[in-house]
Amino acid sequence: MEEDGLNNRNWGYYEPSQFRPNLGFQLIPSILDRNEKPFLSPHSQNLNFITPSNVYGGGSSSVVSYPRDYTVSDAPFMSYSWLNQHKDSKFFSNVPEVSRMTQSMQLLQPEVVTEVDESVKRRHCSGGQRGGVPKVKKEKKLKDNNMPRVQRERSPLLRKCIEMVINGVSMDIGGLPVPVCSCTGMPQQCYRWGCGGWQSACCTTNVSMYPLPVNTKRRGARIAGRKMSQGAFRKVLEKLSSDGFDFSNPIDLKSHWAKHGTNKFVTIR
């Protein structure tokens, strides 16, 4: 078949692809590019390969035909077997080795599980030992009803030791009996008020009765009785000591209350 017969190229020639060739491969150049070098190396020139001189030997009748399997090579395909052969390259140095990571992860998992199991076993063992040992119960002491009970004295006479110098004599006023007030005809014990002071339980400046009426302004409380401070009570003691009063008896404060309700600022003469 002649070259210009049907305006078709011979089937023995390879037309370069329109796509950009891969960097790792080199395809057979077109026959029209006469300045290109042959595909094979110059050492293998004795082999039969396509060159412009071999194709156009003399004329249209000297066209050489070769089998397609010999002239055109198979389409290249990507092989992933070469990835593991370039371990020292700069590109693959940053790629982590997946197989080694998976193996290390598989080895670490059973170790963590064993540690957890050991800790759980220790807890169970410790708990079992604690639970197995019975607690020793303390024996309750039985009360003997025949033994006499010692009652604590809660007498109002038991007070702190408060020493005061009265007319040159040291006196412990904490040991004195509780003063009383006989304004109602019956002596009633007074209440402690402040530090060493006393308060009446049966009289005010207007009322004299026992018990005192309930305070209307404060629920659950009664009207406050007359008051006497520690300083005023000390003056009462000085007066009674000068009169030769026996302090073993309770002091009657009926005549010693102040007219305005308190002896805090009253001077007794």
UniProtKB/Swiss-Prot annotation:
It is found in: Nucleus. Its main location: nucleus. Transmembrane segments: none annotated. Keywords: DNA-binding, Nucleus, Transcription, Transcription regulation. InterPro entries: GAGA-bd_tscrpt_act. One of its GO terms (molecular function) is DNA binding. One of its GO terms (cellular component) is nucleus. Expressed in seedlings, leaves and pistils. Detected in the base of flowers and tips of carpels, in petal vasculature, in anthers, in young rosette, in the lateral and primary roots, and in the gynobasal portion of the ovule. It holds the Pfam family GAGA_bind. Transcriptional regulator that specifically binds to GA-rich elements (GAGA-repeats) present in regulatory sequences of genes involved in developmental processes. Belongs to the BBR/BPC family. This is Protein BASIC PENTACYSTEINE3. It comes from Arabidopsis thaliana (Mouse-ear cress). The gene is BPC3.
